[in-house]
């Protein structure tokens, strides 16, 4: 997409709308809808046949000149036709587009696909499967930034794997199970592992790790005489194994890359998608963008270079936050595709998918 015209930065969708009469809006809508449907520029002759009020190609050209002056459309060098600029797309999405509700069939399809996801799997696997299905429904790449995991804890256990290695198993109240492998000091008896488990279980139940971490450290300091040194070391190591781990760790899951390869029109499209693949592969900026999206309520739309965080000129991102059982925003999901996404269809799909995922995580 072009964003070369300095005027583009100076005009808001509201200001553009006030400068367009019904005829100009109709012509502009045809240019955008043709682009969303085909990816191709459209010329005045074709537009004069498409619009509701008949106009000569010459009159259409005059209106197109005005739209170009406003920075809403541009002429790609290869063609006499016109395409919307990024500003034009933003104007269309904000001011002209009718976002339809999903049909009952579409709702049921999303619900059925997401309901088919295994109940027994981890939250991460659930989200990964949900994104695979969302990418299939939207024909774009689907992304999810998993929530900061800080669940209320139910049980902790140390299981010996080898003489100097144990598995720390942490079970949360919402059924998540986290495992960490822990190096043990030489000569640790099994009784020390049991004592460490008992010490922690008497303090963590029903609370988050961040709530109890300071208290555990204080309790360890006070009870040094009662607990032998090996047990103290195991407890400290067990707590530390989580402090840099799941409580702050966020995963970015990307599914459906192949959808971005469909419908490529030219070498420049291929180059744009190659750059996008690189970004998705290295996760560069994607997590930052989704983190930004998480700060707002509802669906957010980033078109082309509005997204300053990674080289996505020519691509759009549509996101919505999802919530845990207490209604707290814990992550964000969405789709990334070409700027010619079917916005009217994809926006309600992303919104609905976020609601269904929230329901699934809330159970």
Swiss-Prot record:
GO terms for molecular function: DNA binding. Coiled coil: none annotated. InterPro entries: GAF-like_dom_sf, HrcA, HrcA_C, WH-like_DNA-bd_sf, WH_DNA-bd_sf, WHTH_transcript_rep_HrcA_IDD. One of its GO terms (biological process) is negative regulation of DNA-templated transcription. Keywords: Repressor, Stress response, Transcription, Transcription regulation. Pfam families: HrcA (PF01628). Negative regulator of class I heat shock genes (grpE-dnaK-dnaJ and groELS operons). Prevents heat-shock induction of these operons. Belongs to the HrcA family. NCBIfam families: hrcA. This is Heat-inducible transcription repressor HrcA. It comes from Afipia carboxidovorans (strain ATCC 49405 / DSM 1227 / KCTC 32145 / OM5) (Oligotropha carboxidovorans).
